[in-house]
Amino acid sequence: MGDNMHFLPADLSCTSLEEELLTYEHYSESEKSFFICEGVLMYLQPEEIETLFSFIRNHSGAHSSFVFTFMELDNDQICFRNSSALVEKWLSLRSEVFTWGIPRQEVRDFLASVGFDLVQIATDETLRARYIATANPEGLPLAQGECICVAEINVSQIERNRLL
């Protein structure tokens, strides 16, 4: 790992990104940063998600990236499409109830509303075609309904915010 790469784990159910990051000695708000938020947004409320995006947008350098996973909202349901009732029950018993999802076709507009640009969305089909198909032609089962999104801060949004 390079000297400029640091891993800062944070349990957002116990602390805020702001509390963790702004007191971290290696973080600079003016530098381009790369944020990863895997398996988190589906458990947050919409207001918490907007706060997270707002913080990243307002406290990181131009062209910073945010990679996150999200659950696809499908027929008003937030769930893994290929999971059994047993999986749903197991998640429920563990108090892992999904509270936020979004239809894939609405992600670009959502990101624009919070000051980000969509770079790429990877679905189970994308991952299979890109990484698994040649290594496992029999077809390793993948979770359907959770996607990976790569977003970048909209630079004009940063400039507008700094002028206010």
Feature map (PLM): residue ranges:
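Alpha-helical subdomain
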Residues: 1-164
